[in-house]
UniProtKB/Swiss-Prot annotation:
Gene behind the chain: trm10
Lineage, uppermost ranks: Eukaryota, Fungi, Dikarya, Ascomycota, Taphrinomycotina
One annotated GO molecular function: tRNA binding
Subunit structure: Monomer.
Signal peptide start-end: none
Positions that bind S-adenosyl-L-methionine: L183, G203, D207, K208, N209, R210, Y211, C215, L229, K241, I242, L243
A cellular-component GO term for this protein: nucleus
Organism: Schizosaccharomyces pombe (strain 972 / ATCC 24843) (Fission yeast)
Annotated protein name in UniProt: tRNA (guanine(9)-N1)-methyltransferase
Reaction catalysis annotation: guanosine(9) in tRNA + S-adenosyl-L-methionine = N(1)-methylguanosine(9) in tRNA + S-adenosyl-L-homocysteine + H(+)
InterPro entries in alphabetical order: MT_TRM10-typ, MT_TRM10-typ_sf, TRM10/TRM10A, tRNA_m1G_MeTrfase_euk, tRNA_MeTrfase_TRMD/TRM10
Length: 304
């Protein structure tokens, strides 16, 4: 009896010990609530989809780059530029450059938006220039002003050396008409250097060359001198190229810094456009390429 009782007691102790262990294990692993389980499930699903989301972001980024490249090549947007480092002390120039914004009714809304960007680029280039000029925007109003106000939220009101006016350049510089020079690719006159006493006018229009001789005819009717940049003297462009308003401005600005047309052209005009330097001793083109170059030269226009 004593042995049996002893065995029973030992058995009870064993059962009690196993029950205690099981109870402790249960206490160490608390049961999650329904809300906690839902959160855990959502987290697991989120973690599982991490790679897929990353792939989607990469694809969206690739598509954005392709779309921006297309718009830049089509002239719908202006390519952003790296910040330039000034090579010397800033010394303002006495030259005045005018953006003639009197062509509001000749552009569609898309072209107005593009022109607004180009005007902003002109200011940006002038702000970082070694020899900044006084920049005027004449006949400034209509949809262009509305677009600028919408995009910039009044920031342009704080721009230095930027002078928008509803007046025409003839009204703004009434007593200095003889100093006005309208830049036009159709002019018979070629600029060799910029005159610090002159006022240079750029036709502020985005028209994909729809309006032939527009600025040249306007200036001639008003009795204003015209001139074209000496592009033909320094480079050959074997691809059709239309200079934007801001590109013309940047070329003028860089000439003031370098006093070198070739260097200014090469820094502003994209190299992918098939530029050939005439100063290059190895410059040589076949008859086919020469013919294409001559045709491109006749098509070369700024957007005016």
């Amino acid at each position: 009896m004593e042995n049996k009782d002893a065995l029973d007691i030992g058995k009870d102790d064993t059962n009690t010990s196993e029950a205690d262990v099981s109870k402790n294990e249960t206490q160490e692993q608390p049961v999650l609530s329904k809300s906690a389980l839902k959160r855990l499930k959502r987290q697991q699903e989120w973690d599982a989809g991490r790679e897929k989301r990353a792939e989607m972001r990469r694809e969206k980024k690739r598509l954005r780059k392709e779309e921006r490249k297309r718009k830049i090549e089509a002239g719908e947007v202006v390519k952003s530029q790296k910040k330039r480092i000034r090579l010397g002390k800033v010394v303002p120039s006495s030259i005045r450059i005018v953006l003639d914004c009197a062509f509001d009714d000749l552009m569609n809304d898309k072209e107005i938006n593009s022109l607004c960007q180009q005007v902003t680029r002109c200011h940006s280039a002038n702000r970082t220039a070694l020899h900044p000029v006084e920049l005027f925007a004449t006949n400034f109003g209509g949809r262009l002003k509305t677009r600028q106000d919408f995009v910039l939220k009044g920031q342009q009101n704080n721009w230095k050396r930027y002078n928008p006016t509803t007046k025409s350049y003839l009204e703004e510089f009434e007593s200095q008409k003889e100093k006005l020079v309208y830049l036009s690719a159709d002019s018979d006159n070629t600029i060799t250097e910029l005159d610090e006493d002159k006022i240079y006018i750029i036709g502020a229009i985005v028209d994909k060359n729809r309006y032939k001789n527009l600025c040249q005819n306007k200036a001639s009717e008003q009795g204003i001198k015209t001139a074209k940049l000496p592009i033909d003297e320094y480079i050959k462009i074997t691809d059709r190229k239309i200079l934007t308003v801001n590109q013309v401005f940047e070329i003028l600005s860089l000439w003031l810094e370098y006093r070198d047309w070739e260097k200014a052209f090469m820094e502003v005009i994209p190299k992918r456009k098939g530029i050939l330097l005439k100063s290059d001793e190895s410059f040589d083109v076949s008859e086919d390429t020469r013919s294409q170059s001559n045709q491109s030269d006749s098509e070369l226009e700024k957007e005016n």
